[in-house]
């Protein structure tokens, strides 16, 4: 009897509260092999917190995360070697060169830098980093360090890639090159999850775009989906979804008979989610 293959990445009913405030509420995602999915949201929507939970950096209050059917809470090191990630600011050792930082990341993922040398060179050319490979990281701009972090996340050919606003600080040429690198990942069956604010760019790289608002996924947008209100205009679809969610929340507060303090608290909650 053959069963259905598990999702490459599955997030099931995740709840997180920080300082007593709910940050993620019943977050659920399922990504297949070869899929690129994006999460978009306003500042404070919970995007980075979601990625930290997915990568095991933050333990949820409820729910679980599965990589290829295995709970990350009990996954062995080999499972994590198949994951590449870049969350928040790119880390680098200031005294090491860009190349040495990339090699250090490759070793941390259990790969051999000599075997990935061609991949590093190819990715460096795609992101216009070649001329800075031998420069100490302390002398690199934030955008150039972002390129170093991206190559460090991708060079060992991971099965699952998780990236937080990966195009931040990248020049237009590098953005195009990065897009091609993500297509390589999904082309060989890898799975990609990214967050971002650049709507046009997300429609170019993602098969689906989840709208995260106040810790919940309130809509899933499929770029170029026929007949969808807003069509391919992701920005319009995004703000329509956010406005509808806020109006529904306000209506719920009013129908419950709660006083003005409850509405004030609801409005504050929109801006205080980490």
Per-region residue spans from a language model:
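Conserved ABC ATPase "signature" region
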Residues: 103, 107, 115-132
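Conserved ABC transporter NBD signature motif
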Residues: 63-74, 79
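Catalytic Walker B motif of ABC-type/P-loop ATPase nucleotide-binding domains
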Residues: 161-165
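The feature captures the beta-strand-to-loop junction immediately N-terminal to the Walker
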Residues: 40-42
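Helix-to-loop junction immediately C-terminal to a conserved catalytic motif
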Residues: 55
């Amino acid at each position: 009897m053959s069963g259905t293959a598990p999702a490459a990445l599955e997030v099931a009913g995740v709840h997180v509260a920080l300082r007593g405030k709910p940050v993620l509420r019943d977050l659920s995602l399922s990504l297949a092999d070869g899929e690129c999915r994006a999460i978009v949201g306003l500042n404070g929507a919970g995007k980075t917190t979601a990625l930290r939970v997915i990568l095991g950096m933050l333990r949820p209050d409820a729910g679980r995360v599965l990589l290829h059917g295995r709970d990350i809470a009990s996954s062995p090191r080999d499972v994590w070697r198949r994951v590449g990630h870049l969350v928040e600011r790119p880390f680098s050792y200031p005294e090491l060169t860009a190349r040495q930082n990339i090699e250090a990341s490759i070793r941390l993922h259990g790969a051999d830098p000599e075997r990935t040398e061609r991949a590093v060179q190819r990715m460096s050319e795609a992101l216009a980093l070649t001329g800075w490979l031998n420069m100490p990281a302390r002398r690199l701009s934030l955008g150039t360090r972002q390129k170093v972090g991206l190559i460090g996340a991708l060079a060992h050919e991971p099965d699952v890639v998780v990236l937080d606003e990966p195009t931040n600080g990248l020049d237009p040429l590098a953005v195009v090159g990065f897009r091609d690198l993500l297509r390589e990942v999904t082309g060989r069956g890898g799975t990609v999850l990214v967050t971002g604010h650049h709507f046009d760019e997300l429609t170019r790289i993602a098969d689906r775009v989840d709208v995260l608002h106040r810790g919940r996924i309130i809509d899933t947008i499929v770029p170029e989906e026929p007949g969808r209100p807003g069509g391919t205009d992701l920005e319009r679809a995004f703000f329509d979804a956010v406005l509808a969610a806020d109006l529904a929340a306000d209506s719920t507060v009013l129908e419950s008979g709660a006083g003005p303090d409850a509405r004030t608290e609801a409005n504050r909650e929109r801006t205080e989610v980490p």
